[in-house]
Amino acid sequence: MLVSSNEEQLTAHTPTSSSSIEPKILAACSYSLSVGPCSLAVSPKGVNSKSPSLKNETAFVVDSVSTLSAESSALLYNTQSSLLTGLSMNGYLGEYQEDIIHHLITREKNFLLNVHLSNQQPELRWSMRPALVNFIVEIHNGFDLSIDTLPLSISLMDSYVSRRVVYCKHIQLVACVCLWIASKFHETEDRVPLLQELKLACKNIYAEDLFIRMERHILDTLDWDISIPTPASYIPVLDPIFFLVLDASMFVPNLFKFPASKIACSVMNIVNEHVGSFLLTHPSMESYRKDDNFLWPEDLDTVTSYMENMSKRYANEECTDLLFSSLGRISSILAKKYPEQCAMAAWCNMTEKDTERTL
C-alpha cells in the first residue's frame, strides 16, 4: 500500500527572482518540465506544449555507410580495450570476482520494485516517466557527474515512488533530490551540486528548505539504505557505448521486473554481439584485424570468461529483447549526450528505424 507523503509539509514555493548562480546545467539544458496538477510535459525552450507528450523521443536513424572515418574506427576498436581496463581496475578479473558478484546478487533481491504499487499513484502516469528520466539525464549531464550517479538516482526515485504517494507538483523536487542523494553517495564533495543550483534548475519553484525536508523524507522511506545495486554495478567498463545502452534501459518500465544483474547482462550481450560482429566484418576495420590481439588485448581468455560467466548465469532472453526493442527510439537527450556512440550503434545495426519503444 502506498503511503501519503504529507502534502501539507511539501508546498510549492512561489517563484523568486533569478539567482545569481549560473550553473552549467542552464547552458546545457534544452528541455524544461512544466509541473502542475496531473501534467508533466517536456517542451523545448521557447516552445509552448500544454499536454503530456513524448514528441521529444525522436527515432535516431543514421543512413547506412560503407566506410567510417579513421576516428570512428579507432573509437570502435578502443571499446574492447576500455572493457578490459575497467574490469581490471575494479577487481572483476581477480580473485574477488565471485565475491563481488555474489554480494551484488544478494543485495539486488532486496530492491526489486513493486510495479503494482506504482500503478496506484493517483496522479502519476507511466507516460510521464520518459520526460522525467530525460530531465534527470540532462541535469546529470550538465553537472558532468560520474557514470554511477545516474542509474542510482533513477533507482532511488523509482523506489520512493513505489512506496509513497507523489503528486505531480512535487515530482520534479523528488527527481532533483534523488540525484542530489546519489551524487553525495558517489561523487567527491567538490562535485556534489549545490542546493542553490538544484533550486535554479527547478526554476525556483521550490524553497530551499523543501529540498532538505524531501531528502530526509526519501531517506527515511528507504530506511537510509541507498546502496542499491544497479546494472552499472555489473558493468565496470569505461566505454560510453555500454552506457548508451544502459541509459536507454532506464526508459523502459517493463524492465522493472528484472533484477539489475539480468539487465546488465543484456546490455553486455547486445553490445558484444553487434559491435563485435561489426569489428569482425566491416571493411573499415580491416587494418585493425591485422593486430595479433584483435578483438581483445592480451587477456582475452580472462575477459571473455567473465562475460560468458555472466551470460550463462544471469542472461534472460525476454529482458534482452525488451532492451533491444527500446533502442529503436533513442531519447534526443541521449543522442546529444552520446553522439558518436549513437552513430556507432546505428552502424552496428543496434538501432532499427521501425522499432517502437515498449511501454
UniProtKB/Swiss-Prot annotation:
A GO cellular component annotation here is: cytoplasm
GO biological process terms on file: cell cycle G1/S phase transition; cell division; G1/S transition of mitotic cell cycle; negative regulation of cell cycle switching, mitotic to meiotic cell cycle; positive regulation of G1/S transition of mitotic cell cycle; regulation of G1/S transition of mitotic cell cycle; signaling
Q: Which UniProt keywords apply?
A: Cell cycle, Cell division, Cyclin
What molecular function terms (GO) are annotated for this protein? cyclin-dependent protein serine/threonine kinase regulator activity
> Which SUPFAM superfamilies has this protein been placed in?
Cyclin-like (SSF47954)
Which Pfam families does this entry report, sorted A to Z? Cyclin_N (PF00134)
> What task does this protein carry out?
Function in exit from the mitotic cycle. Contributes to negative regulation of the timing of sexual development in fission yeast, and functions at the transition between cycling and non-cycling cells. Interacts with protein kinase A.
**Which family, according to UniProt?**
Belongs to the cyclin family.
This protein is called what? Cyclin puc1
The organism named in the record is Schizosaccharomyces pombe (strain 972 / ATCC 24843) (Fission yeast)
